[in-house]
């Protein structure tokens, strides 16, 4: 996800799962997708400084304030993001860990540990300002359960602070099980991963391009339309 903004489009299918496609530039009017309402997602901390929110715009930040390599929290960045007029201000990224080979229980543990540390630092009010970014692997039923388990564990944590919050989950297809020389297989795997995320109850889904090298407009369009096909098939 190298682009600065992603647009998430809400689908009123039976799964009620928004989905997204990648933009390399700023906001645009995609009238052909009239059935879907645009929901901008910020993934670049430098861009966030220049965004002017409007009454009809809802920005969701996927920017993680934790340095997973150093194991530290960037408190100043967190304060700057919380000062923004976003719908949700801070991302908790555990897709990095899935793509690095972490087990499901490790991914969930890291997500909850990050949440607890943020809550202790900024108070319980931060719980409804978080976006969980997760990657969905090939183990269909286990990945479906991972999404639901994250909802349950987060909700249980919020109850410890006297709240009853449900997490906002942004799920994307995994990169770990994709191959440069097997594009068709990548397409099949990512479709199953999307289905697992949607059935599991993710609030938004994103498809990484199935062509790991020499990606083009056609491959981007096909990757995006995977999500549309699943929404209508449901």
Language-model features and meaning:
Residues 106-107, 138-149, 176-188, 215-223:
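Short glycine/threonine-rich loop-to-helix capping motif typified by GTGT followed
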Residues 1-140, 166, 204, 208, ...:
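Catalytic alpha/beta active-site cores
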